[in-house]
Amino acid sequence: MFARGLKRKYGDQEEGVEGFGTVPSYSLQRQSLLDMSLVKLQLCHMLVEPNLCRSVLIANTVRQIQEEMSQDGVWHGMAPQNVDRAPVERLVSTEILCRTVRGAEEEHPAPELEDAPLQNSVSELPIVGSAPGQRNPQSSLWEMDSPQENRGSFQKSLDQIFETLENKNSSSVEELFSDVDSSYYDLDTVLTGMMSGTKSSLCNGLEGFAAATPPPSSTCKSDLAELDHVVEILVET
């Protein structure tokens, strides 16, 4: 019987009988703990807002394992050629780290590869523009805006107008504008009409105002009569 709170531990013989494997060595446990701590520490740094307490605990664990391995001479004795011979448990962290780095590289490819097709397209642009031959920019605008038939008719009409203006003399030009009523363009008549209208309206307004108001002499006489009457009343009292 075992005391309360104690755990039963199997011996080496009992482990073999029960089918359990041998307990891994301390160095392997320490190495696996170091690998997991490094992976967790890197994942903490990848977060936007890492947990400070968690990252400090993981960093202290890594530092403690490093000190133990340096005291045992394993830290300085690790050679790069022994990496291929390492067990699978030790390579788990390196595989995870390499996988994350490869995924980041696939998501964000190198800028040189992205710029290459752009440079090729830019180099092809002048070739395409120069292949049909040099064209007048005015002709390209005509082709884009309207069909060829409309363009020809419009140019013919413009040519006819310019020819008529060049061939006719000043008298013919005056005949063109003879139908226009010149009274609309006579500035003197317009201004005189405006001034006469304003004068008549102002005079009418002043005459009406003068007729409505009584003469000043009559108002003064009435005021004096009222004052005399008031003075007489005061004297009698």
From Swiss-Prot:
Q: Which InterPro entries match?
A: E2F-SERTA_domain_protein (IPR052262), SERTA_dom (IPR009263)
User: Can you list the disulfide-bonded cysteine pairs?
Assistant: none
Record's Gene Ontology CC terms? cytosol; nucleoplasm; nucleus; plasma membrane
Q: Where is the SERTA domain?
A: 26-73
Tissue expression: Expressed preferentially in hematopoietic progenitors and mature blood cells. Expressed at low levels in the heart, lung, spleen, and thymus and at a higher level in muscle.
Question: Which cell locations does it reside in?
Answer: Nucleus
Q: Its principal location?
A: nucleus
Any idea which UniProt keywords this protein has? Nucleus
Superkingdom, natural source: Eukaryota
Q: Which Pfam families is this protein grouped with?
A: SERTA
Q: Which residues form the signal peptide?
A: none
Which PANTHER family does the record associate with it?
CELL DIVISION CYCLE ASSOCIATED PROTEIN 4/SERTA DOMAIN-CONTAINING PROTEIN 2, CELL DIVISION CYCLE-ASSOCIATED PROTEIN 4
What this protein is reported to do is described as: May participate in the regulation of cell proliferation through the E2F/RB pathway. May be involved in molecular regulation of hematopoietic stem cells and progenitor cell lineage commitment and differentiation.
The name under which this protein is listed is Cell division cycle-associated protein 4
Organism the protein comes from: Mus musculus (Mouse)
Q: Which gene encodes it?
A: Cdca4
